Every structure is written in C-alpha cells, then in structure tokens.
C-alpha cells in the first residue's frame, strides 16, 4: 500500500540505540514543493530538515486515481491500500464484517508503548482517524469517535468534532480538556 523512500541516513543506524520516542509527523497534503517554496520565500531552514531520519511516501487508492486522506492515511498507518473514504478497513469489506487491519498506533499500544494521535483537524478527521479508528466511511464521525474511545490509545488531541463530550470521554475513562 505504501512506498517509503528514505531521504537521510537509514534507521538501521539506530537499531542498537535505546529509542524512547517516535513521532510520525504528517503534513497532510504537503509536498516537497511546499517546503521548498517556504524556505525560499522566508529564507530559512526548516527544523524538519535537521531530523536524523526522514522519509517520504507515495500512497495510492485502490479505487480512484486521486487518493483521499482516508485511503492515504490508511496506507500510512496500516500499510495496506483501500478505497477512498475507507478508514483502516480492507477494500473487500464494505459492510465491516471482517477483522480490521492493525494500524501502527494499535501495534505500539499492544507492545506496551504510550500512544497518541495529535491533529489540527477534528479528532475524527480522515488522517487522524486512520491512526486511531476503523470505519467504512470517513464521514461517520459518531462511529469513528466511539472507536477512538474504545481504542485504549493514551492521548487523542484535536479540534472538537461535535460528537465527543466530557460525559462521553469520562464514560470511556478519558479526560476531556
């Protein structure tokens, strides 16, 4: 589902080190052209240019020439291709019958790591949802929010989506701030 191209030294150089934190930073919809334009216009170096490990990826929807954020996010988070609007689900499961593909946040959680999804979007937006939920349609905010609360992810932080409330968060053992 995803092609990743390292742009700096390999992560293999760090295998013997005790790595405590990993941040998977996504500039949703951003390309190298946006970064270069920013550097040229402002005459600055970007902090992300100093990161020890960097990479890029090209994601493709299975059903459309243009990939939406749900299919792209699923490719990044689960390593599979799906249909546009599908969030962390298999292509041949439009009725949501089968087990879902595991996303990287769930994999880390299951390996006793602290996990979080932080976004400037709504918490149920397509890209953050791909790392924290599974839904047959990206616009099913209620289903996505419930799945996020059931996920046991340590932190979900973003803008209000009109679904999550303090009471709902408390019911699932979360603190709503």
Question: How does the language model describe each region?
Answer:
Residues 1-176:
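N-terminal catalytic scaffold of extracellular/periplasmic and nuclease hydrolases
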């Amino acid at each position: 589902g995803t092609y990743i191209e390292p742009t700096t030294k390999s992560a293999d150089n760090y295998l013997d080190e005790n790595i405590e934190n990993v941040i998977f930073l996504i500039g949703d919809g951003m390309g190298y052209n946006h970064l270069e334009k920013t550097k040229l216009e402002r005459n600055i170096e970007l902090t992300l240019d100093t990161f020890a490990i960097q990479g890029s990826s090209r994601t493709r929807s299975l059903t459309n020439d243009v990939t939406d954020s749900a299919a792209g996010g699923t490719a990044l988070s689960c390593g599979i291709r799906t249909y546009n609007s599908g969030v962390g689900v298999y292509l041949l499961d439009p009725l949501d019958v089968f087990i879902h593909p595991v996303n990287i946040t769930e994999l880390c959680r299951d390996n006793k790591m602290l996990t979080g999804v932080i976004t400037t979007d709504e918490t149920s937006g397509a890209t953050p949802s791909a790392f924290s939920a599974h839904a047959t349609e990206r616009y099913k905010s209620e289903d996505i929010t419930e799945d996020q609360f059931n996920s046991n992810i340590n932190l979900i932080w973003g803008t209000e989506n009109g679904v999550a409330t303090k009471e709902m968060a408390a019911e699932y053992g979360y603190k709503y701030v």
